[in-house]
């Protein structure tokens, strides 16, 4: 069960929410467009399982209104239907959410708000999504649904590639830290530990913190255990569902540990490609917002934190191109043509989620300039659809 959010949360967006909502705003329209154009009646289903109030007090759109705006745009401009379902257990938050939803419903947007926990409506939404693509957005302030429940949805109820099913969820690093303390303490709360066992799909996570609490454990072992648990959670979800799973850290400030990770799951190589591009663009918005906040808080400062700590995007992109070209060269050594979108992670390597799509085309051009591919990278299909051939003998 999510613990909910207090009133301070809804005044305006914190930096983690800036990243999360920018990512959702960029990716959801592309998911809807990619899958809806091939679905029955052009219909896509979206579930926001922890919708909160839907809108911040300063008027900024939260996750619910972001989805409603996408749905409104699809209806007006693209002839697609994004049917939205929202759940929120807290009465006051639900009342505000419902007002936002009703405003869009009055304009013809197919949207439904339910007061209660997401687990109580999940199966009903899945039934509504039969024959249609489904996107699940689960963003609790606390613990997410048990992994067995998620696996049941992704691997049993929705195991097929088409219509597509995708998941974007918040895996709380703060909750892992708090519950890891129960493992390390002789007075730990066993009920809380069992609840997190359910979230993780087993007791395996406890071992990481038991090792961190052992005599002679090095400094920082507990902090590293949090990261290890998050990484293993994503690996297990991928193995149990057969999906591509990526885990993106989200923090309050540069060089700080993540407060949560956004875990993304898809069966589509196109989804994996577009998500990486969306992450890179959301990361840029995060830095821009931080810089704006610093300017507002201290307009007379000579230097901002951003100017000192932010990696120059142009430098990162410039460094990425030869590294990605080398990755592509390695793929071509098999002697067969390579369709870029089918090798997203191999192509981008460490730069996945760090650089945007144009870096991939530039890598093709770079490799062509070295005489290692006959494909020029100029013109033609969308970058993701480029087919790159080995150099002619």
Where do the language-model regions lie?
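Class I S-adenosyl-L-methionine-dependent methyltransferase catalytic core
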Residues: 1-340, 348-393
């Amino acid at each position: 069960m999510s613990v909910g959010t207090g009133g301070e949360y809804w005044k305006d967006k914190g930096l983690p929410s800036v990243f999360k909502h920018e990512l959702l705003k960029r990716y959801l329209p592309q998911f809807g467009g990619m899958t809806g154009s091939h679905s029955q009646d052009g219909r896509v289903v979206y579930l926001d399982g922890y919708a909160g109030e839907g809108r911040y007090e300063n008027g900024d759109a939260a996750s619910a209104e972001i989805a409603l705006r996408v749905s409104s745009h699809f209806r007006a401009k693209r002839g697609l239907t994004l049917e939205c379902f929202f759940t929120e257990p807290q009465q006051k938050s639900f009342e505000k959410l419902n007002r936002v939803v009703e405003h869009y419903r009055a304009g013809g947007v197919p949207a439904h708000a339910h007061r209660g926990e997401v687990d109580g409506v999940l199966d009903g939404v899945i039934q509504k999504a039969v024959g249609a693509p489904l996107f699940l957005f689960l963003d609790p302030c606390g613990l997410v649904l048990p992994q067995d429940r998620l696996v049941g949805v992704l691997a049993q109820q929705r195991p097929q590639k088409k219509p597509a099913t995708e998941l974007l969820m918040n895996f709380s690093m703060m909750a892992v830290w708090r519950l890891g303390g129960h493992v390390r303490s002789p007075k730990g709360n066993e009920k809380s530990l069992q609840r997190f066992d359910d979230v993780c799909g087993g007791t395996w996570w406890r071992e990481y913190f038991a090792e961190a609490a052992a005599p002679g454990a090095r400094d920082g072992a507990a902090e590293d255990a949090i990261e290890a648990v998050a990484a293993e959670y994503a690996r297990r979800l991928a193995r149990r569902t057969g999906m591509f799973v990526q885990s993106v850290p989200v923090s309050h400030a540069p060089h700080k540990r993540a407060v949560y990770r956004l875990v993304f799951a898809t069966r589509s190589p196109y989804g994996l490609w577009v998500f990486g591009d969306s992450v890179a663009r959301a990361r840029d918005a995060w830095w821009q917002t931080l810089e704006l906040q610093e300017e507002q808080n201290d307009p007379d400062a000579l230097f901002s934190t951003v100017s000192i700590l932010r990696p120059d995007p142009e430098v990162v992109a410039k460094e990425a191109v030869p590294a990605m070209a080398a990755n592509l060269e390695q793929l071509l050594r098999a002697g067969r043509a390579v369709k870029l979108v089918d090798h997203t992670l191999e192509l981008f390597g460490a730069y996945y989620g760090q650089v945007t799509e144009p870096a991939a085309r530039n890598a093709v051009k770079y490799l062509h300039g070295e005489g290692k591919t006959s494909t020029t990278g100029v013109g033609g299909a969308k970058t993701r659809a480029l087919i790159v051939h080995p150099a002619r003998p």
